[in-house]
Amino acid sequence: YALLPWSDMLTGKAARLDMARALLRNTLGERAAALDIALDLPAFGKSGVAAGIDRQLLAGLRAAAKARRLRLSSVQPRLIAELSAQQKQLNDGWLACLDLGWLTLAGIRDGEISSLRNHRASTAEPAILAGELAGLLAAESATVNGKKVLISTSAGAAPKLAGGWETT
């Protein structure tokens, strides 16, 4: 994932896609070249989010659907789906998505995404993962005033956080 900061010079889809490619290349290096990138549709003047999926994985999903005479009409990144569902509820707070090997932290300020961090998790062990999440929250706490953290996990229970964070 990459946060696409608002710029009045980059309002078209092609310009936003170029920015997303550059940001993902900066984060992922050469692996970014293998991604199919999707952009959200932010309101004018607001930052947006780009998500990348491995092209071969997407092609495999499409082929599997076609082999079963199905049509794959949409593949939606979990972070985008979670943001859509929870953004207004959080208002000033954090959304943490814990996936196998990755921790993604989105800061929401005044109902809009204001920061986004991807972190390769060192383990799936809840206590250690809680420490890594707490470290990211501490490092990013200047960007969002809220102490509310919605934790979405693809497997297992959400880790418990110390330090006054209100988790849901």
Which role does the model predict for each range below?
Residues 1-168:
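Hydrophobic/aromatic-enriched cytosolic interaction surfaces used to assemble or bind macromolecules
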